[in-house]
Amino acid sequence: GQHVELEVNGVIFEIHLSLIGEFQLFNVLAALGLVSAEEGSEVLNYLENLDKIKGVPGRLEHIGTHPTGAPIVVDYAHTPDALKNILVSLRPHVKGKLVCVFGAGGDRDKEKRPFMGKVASVLADITIVTDDNPRSESPMVIREEIMKGCPSAQNVGGRSEAISLGLSNLSDGDLLVIAGKGHETRQEIAGTTIPFNDAAFVQTQLNDVVGEVQ
């Protein structure tokens, strides 16, 4: 989340938001102003409840914490601009490495793939390119097209393997963002739909790590 100092009528208030990212803070403040204006009441009446606001599933959603203390976030970003926005939003929350796992969907917007790779290579410290929903396309070809924009990234076929690699890279102060699928619960590969959810897989991996430690 984030702690924010907000000045209202000359008085400074400290508020906490469970939401991550500057743009989400601005959205909350805009909504706060609209509600206050509509109901004719003071903004102060709503400040104490801001910490109860829940984010949209799959939108910069915090899904777990690695044993090292590193937070793990998922997001639906699947365009260069969206990927840029989330990486820029997450950077202030990272003291160590920003690790990004992402792919690109098949059968659409092929021209965006190298640009997504370029964005990740510039804004993330570790980039792992993997499969999204390849649909009827070759997953390997999609990854290779992304890699044109980030030749130093790690190319990992299989989303679960890529996420596992991302988790293994985490240390105290790091943050892992898994982009592209958000809260989706299925993956489309070669005309077949299989169950897969980023958050559920991460939780299974974290449970295994905790079990090994115990």
Predicted ranges, named:
Residues 15-22:
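A short glycine-threonine-serine/GTX helix/turn-capping micro-motif
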Residues 1-14:
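Acidic-glycine-rich active-site phosphate/pyrophosphate-binding loop
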Residues 10, 20, 30-214:
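ATP-dependent carboxylate-amine ligase
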Residues 5, 23-24, 51:
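C-terminal accessory "lid"/substrate-recognition subdomains
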